Design a protein with these regions (language model features):
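Primary mode marks residue(s) on the alpha4-beta5-alpha5 output face of response regulator receiver
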Residues: 28-219
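Intrinsically disordered, low-complexity sequence elements enriched in Ser/Thr/Gly/Pro
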Residues: 1-3, 16, 35, 40
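Bacterial N-terminal signal peptides
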Residues: 10-21
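Signal peptide processing junction and immediate N-terminal pro/mature segment
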Residues: 22-28
Length: 219
């Protein structure tokens, strides 16, 4: 499937950071999981991920920081805006999620797959079932009251699925939050990775408004 020539900048990206949601229970296909692992193995090296088009959102938006809450931790999200379309491909996650260790080294733990609801329903029909991968439905991040049809982050509703390919998650491979990792090493990571800079680990709570910036790849 041909990918769109436009891409949503990192400020347009928001994960399901407000709650843990239920997903389908069909068994994941080992072949798809193996394909996802094989495709993302090289991204343990962040420089390789960045050369492939992934990047940390800019300072001042929730996903610039190490995302955590009492249920567990996600980590830092490196996002590839060129992949934000209606294509669902286990070998091309829209985001890579890294967790810091105590020394500030970042380790690839999860991949995240994202599809915006509007384009998905334009292609598959209004009310169409959500995207699915690995036998699991994506979870919808829905419109929020008072945000003119957008999510709490003032971007259009979207579907997401976290997959902990590289770090065991006691809450389940497809749960957004992993209680076995933390953001305790985030400050040390900020000292090692200039992409991070000065950060504070925080919950991506229902606060703030972030504009959705869209540009062409040539702009």
């Amino acid at each position: 499937m041909r990918r769109s020539k436009t891409w949503l900048a990192a400020t347009c990206m928001a994960m399901a950071a407000l709650t843990t949601v239920a997903v389908g229970t069909v068994a994941a296909q080992p072949s798809d999981l193996n394909a996802a692992r094989a495709a993302t193995a090289r991204f343990h090296d962040i420089s390789v991920a960045e050369n492939a088009g992934y990047g940390l959102p800019p300072a001042g938006v929730p996903l610039h920081e190490c995302i955590t809450n009492p249920l567990g931790t996600m980590g830092f999200h490196w996002i590839n805006g060129n992949l934000l379309d209606t294509t669902v491909d286990p070998t091309q996650p829209e985001a890579l999620v890294y967790q810091p260790d105590a020394n500030g080294n970042l380790h690839l733990g999860a991949a995240e797959y994202v599809v915006f609801q509007g384009p998905w329903e334009a292609e598959h029909g209004v009310g169409a079932p959500p995207p699915s991968l690995f036998g699991h439905d994506f979870a919808l991040v829905p419109p929020a009251p008072g945000h003119n049809g957008n999510t709490i982050f003032d971007i259009p509703p979207f579907y997401q699925l976290h997959v902990w390919l590289w770090n065991s998650n006691p809450s389940g491979m497809f749960s957004p939050w992993n209680p076995s990792v933390s953001c305790d090493g985030a400050a040390a990571a900020a000292a090692k990775y200039p992409q991070i800079g000065t950060i504070n680990a925080k919950l991506a709570a229902a606060v703030g408004r972030f504009a959705c910036h869209v540009r062409t790849r040539d702009s």
